């Protein structure tokens, strides 16, 4: 058995280990019983709404997957079409599994908070997040290794494997856009009518949109985020393997083996790190989660050093891996600087809210723009270091390094919406106030980890898209026997740059408009219920929660189609015209997409935590004050920024890159 075959078997084995670890955490969650009927009723309603959304979304996506697979089979190859279908199915399974456990963990976290305080509640919420994290990387590693093994056995080209990444990317985009529209339509509707107009607290059971709001936390922040990082994870490995086979070396085997082994040991590191996240007295929750992430990173660096030595590769490759990993941690740190409660940036938003909503919005936008500086410098330094030490392959392996700890990052990130849901369930079930106080502490940490997760997703998207772009260039070079030169003085390249730069803004406009349209429907429905059922406010009548869930589901699925199709159609049209123009388009979209994504994510995070800071008594103000009402408006503007448009841009730049890579054989025929 040769080295590469051994590595693929290792990948399959580690993937299975990761899935078994996810199963262990799922059983930990299920160990806690929901013994309060009201909690069980609300948990079941949230689960039913979340799974109904996924079922409706997948019905639409099945048609899309079949159409694209047939086109790939006709114009590229049948194996590419098969890999595309497998990528789509695997991404859907990962999202479905994460959603199922998250909608079990939420009610159990509320019960744990009531019976065991912060320590037990953290245990349940984090276990729910760990299931998502370890499922994402376990499925990714298992399926990718299996496909590579089968392709070697039957003699299929590695280029066909890129279809797997395209399938994962396609599902990820629709999951992010659809989930993002759903969650923010419900959130904006619940906030504007409930908090601002009716003056009732967040998650109050009298608010008709409150169940839809809690369903949205799962479809957007669990399934959507998991699909996003799943796509980055497999995309970075595929890009690196593609580049490895195109390297001018006698034996590409160690270069192909490196990303698989590094990712496999990253999974082991993540599993070990998840075991360290526990607290006996409920103190220092944020510190425990941060420590777990750092442990995963340190273990991965140590393992990577051994792997590079074992494979006999140049140490420059190791330095590129470290550059990627460190860049991920530094970007996460700077995200916290601009979005954490108590930090200067968030204080600026809270202060600005004192003079009204307009000044709060202006300050948030300024913070978002300012927050792009440090992450972009970090990404630029990581790119330069990795290129100097390993060439284009170095940039790709840096992306693999950054994403090696995805299991732990997703676990920490997915814990947030579980904790948020637990607070909502506690409020709606009218559990004792101290239960809500406990879940609020977890949720406050969850907001910070979610912001950090978004920063990580953006940074990893930048490196993954760049590595896919490099693979695209090398693939064109190989098929045309001449170097593809992306010269900025070439009119075709300039045209592509402008179109790519514009796509970011068009895509953001479409997703923001979609949230606005869906939110208007939600606001009108909530107002109608308050108007026609006056007994809701004095609790003598029950709101129609199901109607609000139906509105969010229908609107989000209808509005997600155009942005999703746009991301695939535009690179195809430009690529058929000119491979140089397509190169320019990918470069233009990469630059503007990363900048816009960071700005939107951090502005939204600052508005969100600025509002929460006021709710905690900032400068003597509290819920219902003029300062708080202004901050709620800012947070409402920030909701589609940080949870719909911003995160969707990550996938836009990656999907266009991998579509371009997969379709290179078609494009060169038209040159």
Swiss-Prot record:
Site (Important for ion transport) residue list: 176, 221, 228, 643, 654
Site (described: Determinant of potassium dependence): 450
Membrane topology of the entry: Multi-pass membrane protein
Family, per entry: Belongs to the H(+)-translocating pyrophosphatase (TC 3.A.10) family. K(+)-stimulated subfamily.
Catalytic activity: Na(+)(in) + diphosphate + H2O = Na(+)(out) + 2 phosphate + H(+)
Binding site for Ca(2+): 608, 635, 639
Pfam name, any one: H_PPase
Organism of derivation: Fusobacterium nucleatum subsp. nucleatum (strain ATCC 25586 / DSM 15643 / BCRC 10681 / CIP 101130 / JCM 8532 / KCTC 2640 / LMG 13131 / VPI 4355)
PANTHER family, alphabetized: K(+)-INSENSITIVE PYROPHOSPHATE-ENERGIZED PROTON PUMP
Function recorded in the entry: Sodium pump that utilizes the energy of pyrophosphate hydrolysis as the driving force for Na(+) movement across the membrane.
Gene Ontology annotations of biological process type: sodium ion transport
Location in or out of the cell: Cell inner membrane
List of residues binding Mg(2+) 2: 214, 217, 420
Highest taxon, organism lineage: Bacteria
Entry EC no(s): 7.2.3.1
Protein name: Putative K(+)-stimulated pyrophosphate-energized sodium pump
Binding residues annotated for Mg(2+) 1, in chain numbering: 187, 191
Alphabetical UniProt keywords: Calcium, Cell inner membrane, Cell membrane, Ion transport, Magnesium, Membrane, Metal-binding, Potassium, Sodium, Sodium transport, Translocase, Transmembrane, Transmembrane helix, Transport
InterPro entries xrefs: PPase-energised_H-pump
Gene designation: hppA
Cofactor: Mg(2+)
Activity regulation, per record: Requires K(+) for maximal activity.
Binding-site list for substrate: 184, 642
Cellular compartments per GO CC: plasma membrane
Transmembrane residue ranges: 3-23, 60-80, 81-101, 130-150, 154-174, 229-249, 255-275, 295-315, 317-337, 365-385, 392-412, 450-470, 493-513, 559-579, 581-601, 651-671
């Amino acid at each position: 058995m040769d080295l590469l075959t051994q590595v693929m078997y290792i990948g399959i084995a580690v993937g299975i280990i990761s899935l078994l670890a996810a199963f262990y955490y799922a059983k930990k969650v299920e160990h806690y019983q929901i013994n309060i009927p009201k909690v069980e009723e609300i948990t079941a309603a949230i689960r039913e709404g979340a799974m109904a959304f996924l079922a409706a979304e997948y019905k639409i996506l099945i048609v899309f997957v079949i159409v694209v697979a047939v086109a790939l089979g006709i114009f590229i190859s049948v194996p590419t079409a098969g890999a595309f279908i497998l990528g789509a199915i695997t991404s859907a399974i990962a999202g479905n599994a994460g959603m199922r456990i998250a909608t079990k963990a939420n009610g159990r976290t509320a019960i744990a908070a009531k019976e065991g305080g912060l320590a037990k509640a953290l245990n349940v919420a984090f276990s729910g997040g760990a299931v998502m994290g370890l499922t994402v990387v376990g499925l990714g590693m298992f399926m990718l290794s299996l496909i590579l093994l089968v392709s070697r056995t039957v003699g299929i080209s590695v280029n066909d494997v890129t279809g797997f990444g395209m399938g994962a990317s396609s599902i990820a985009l629709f999951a992010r856009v659809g989930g993002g529209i759903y969650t923010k339509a419900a959130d904006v509707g619940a906030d504007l009518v409930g908090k601002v107009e009716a003056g009732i607290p967040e998650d109050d059971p009298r608010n008709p949109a409150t169940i839809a709001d809690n369903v949205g936390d799962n479809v957007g922040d669990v399934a959507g985020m998991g699909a996003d990082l799943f796509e980055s994870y497999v995309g970075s490995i595929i890009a690196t393997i593609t580049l490895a086979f195109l390297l001018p070396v006698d034996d590409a085997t160690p270069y192909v083996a490196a990303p698989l082994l590094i990712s496999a040991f990253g999974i082991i590191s993540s599993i070990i790190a998840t075991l360290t996240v526990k607290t006996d007295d409920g103190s220092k929750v944020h510190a425990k989660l941060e420590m777990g992430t750092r442990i995963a990173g340190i273990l991965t660096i140590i393992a990577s050093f051994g792997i590079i030595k074992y494979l006999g590769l140049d140490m420059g490759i190791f330095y590129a891996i470290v550059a990627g990993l460190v860049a991920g941690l530094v970007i996460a740190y700077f995200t916290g600087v601009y979005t954490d409660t108590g930090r200067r940036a968030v204080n600026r938003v809270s202060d600005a809210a004192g003079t009204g909503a307009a000044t709060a919005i202006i300050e948030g936008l300024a913070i978002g723009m300012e927050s792009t500086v440090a992450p972009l410098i970090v990404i630029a330094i990581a790119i330069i270091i990795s290129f100097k030490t390993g060439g284009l392959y170095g940039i790709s392996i840096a992306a693999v390094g950054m994403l090696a700890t995805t299991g732990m990052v997703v676990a920490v990130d997915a814990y947030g919406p579980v904790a948020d849901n637990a607070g909502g369930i506690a409020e709606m079930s009218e559990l004792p106030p101290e239960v809500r106080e406990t879940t609020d502490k977890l949720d406050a940490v969850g907001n910070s980890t979610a912001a950090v997760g978004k920063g990580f997703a953006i940074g990893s998207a930048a490196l993954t898209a760049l590595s896919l772009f490099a693979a695209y260039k090398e693939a064109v070079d190989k098929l045309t026997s001449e170097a593809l030169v992306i010269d900025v003085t070439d009119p075709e390249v300039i045209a592509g740059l402008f179109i790519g730069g514009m796509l970011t803004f068009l895509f953001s406009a479409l997703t923001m408009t979609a949230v606005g349209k869906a939110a208007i429907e939600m606001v009108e429905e909530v107002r109608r219920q308050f108007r026609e059922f006056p007994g809701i406010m004095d609790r003598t009548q029950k709101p129609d929660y199901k109607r609000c869930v139906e509105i969010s589901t229908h609107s989000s699925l209808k509005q997600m189609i155009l942005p999703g199709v746009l991301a695939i159609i535009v690179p195809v049209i430009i690529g058929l015209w000119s491979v140089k123009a397509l190169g320019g388009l990918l470069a233009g979209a990469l630059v503007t997409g990363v900048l816009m994504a960071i700005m939107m994510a951090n502005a939204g995070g600052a508005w969100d935590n600025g509002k929460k800071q006021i709710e905690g008594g900032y400068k003597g103000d509290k819920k219902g004050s003029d300062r708080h009402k202004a901050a709620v408006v800012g947070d409402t503007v920030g909701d589609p920024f940080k949870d719909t448009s911003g995160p969707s841009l990550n996938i836009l730049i990656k999907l266009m890159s991998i579509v371009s890579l997969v379709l290179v054989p078609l494009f060169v025929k038209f040159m």
